[in-house]
Amino acid sequence: MPLNLEEILALPDIGQKINYLKKGRKTELPDRCKLWDDWNPERHEIIVDKEKYPDRKVLDKESEKVFDEKTGKTYEIEAKYKTEPVNRISIPLEQDIVNIQTAFTVGTEPSMDCTPTDDDEKKLLDAVKAVFKSNKIKYQNKKIVRAWLSEQEAAEYWYVTDDDSFWAKFWKKVKTTFGGKVKPTKKLKSVLWSPFRGDKLYPFFNDEGKMIAFSREYKKKLMDDSEVTCFMTITDKMVYQWDLSKGYEERTPFAHGFPKLPVLYAYRPEPYCKKIKTFRVRLEKLLSNYADCIDYHFFPLLKLIGDVEGFMGKVKDRMVKLTGEGADAQYLTWNQANDTVKFEVETLFEKAYSMTNTPQISFEKLSGAG
């Protein structure tokens, strides 16, 4: 049994090697499907679970008895029913809370507090800022925070690619800082990995809890629309890659050129909004059922009591003439108070935001703020 990372990478059996690299992860893999069902409002159970929230069965035609003259028997035709869809209102509550938290965390771009001591350091700082700008770090930071809060984990991988156009704009200004003779032909780039992007992440920790390698399993789509499972491992010096189709096939490993592991990894044991999921489920059920009540009871019905003797007036203003004892006509209106429903909805919304320490930034909430 291999004892360290070097021994694992030296194993001749690729399948065994990958299995050991996966065991370097100390936590359970996030349940991507379950997380996606909570994140995507189109996948909420109020929308997809037709057993728990069935459509309404409505009588379309009553049963009737029919006499068959040929046989002299009477047959009963069964009643016919039709399925009427019920209201299904989903609320993207998790998305709203996570987006607000992301905006308050990195909505304002983090500033680098750095005071260069000489001209070379100033030029080096300009180069670092240019790298961040070309990689759109301002926007990638938001994606990272959003993924970390909703998907439990995210990783940012930095790598080098051939591209001399990056240095064309400011090479004259910084060439003395970088030696001054040969213009670099490489460019720093970064990419985000997370469960919703189809990645299974396997950070490899040693006994001291230090991440000494990082692996990623993903599917690559080929030109013929077939998919190949790929596994890559990054260490402090090298990048190893394997493809799995009929069997494992190893690609040529290469040195990434950095003095340390070029991966930033963030993990949390549960999604940020797990504690308020029951609130969201109750809200969706409450609003959907209330919408059905409004559809069926909002418009008043005319109740006629007595014998209809005739009609008077024109078609537009026609009146019904009722006779008999207790003859009357009145509208049936829905007199149920909706205060309890309103109170529960407002309470659940307020608790969902307060328990996640998330400010409500709607116009109504902010209108009274000083």
Predicted regions and their residues:
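Extended, helix-rich architectural segments
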Residues: M1-L188
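Charged, low-complexity, helix-prone segments enriched in Lys/Glu/Asp/Gln
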Residues: N19-R43, I47-D49, I137-S150, C230, ...
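A structural detector for beta-sheet-dominated domains
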Residues: L21, W36, D49, E78, ...
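Generic low-complexity segments that are intrinsically disordered, proline-rich and/or Lys/Arg-biased
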Residues: D55, V86, L93, S111, ...
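Solvent-exposed, flexible loop/coil residues
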Residues: P116, N141, E153, K200, ...
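Extended, regular secondary-structure scaffolds
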Residues: K142-R268
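Extended, charged amphipathic alpha-helical segments
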Residues: G247-G370
